[in-house]
């Protein structure tokens, strides 16, 4: 279910402050965050945000097509390596 329109999109306060500070300075710097639930807003476009996936921070460059999505959507937490092979020779 989507978030109610009368509420604003959720963005962590510390992340919003860092974005605003970099926008006023017009600098580009990697922003490290653990806030996977934050929504990408238009002021984040053009920045690189390192999103935590449970083990490490993955640097993600924010484009205009990502606006409205959550940060966690772009940092997968598990890696599927395929199903176990059915090798009958090793069972004998």
From Swiss-Prot:
It is found in: Plastid, Chloroplast. Pfam families: Ribosomal_S19. InterPro entries: Ribosomal_uS19, Ribosomal_uS19_bac-type, Ribosomal_uS19_CS, Ribosomal_uS19_SF. Gene3D superfamilies: 30s Ribosomal Protein S19, Chain A (3.30.860.10). Belongs to the universal ribosomal protein uS19 family. HAMAP family: Ribosomal_uS19. The keyword Transmembrane helix does not apply. Keywords: Chloroplast, Plastid, Ribonucleoprotein, Ribosomal protein, RNA-binding, rRNA-binding. It comes from Citrus sinensis (Sweet orange). This is Small ribosomal subunit protein uS19c. The gene is rps19.
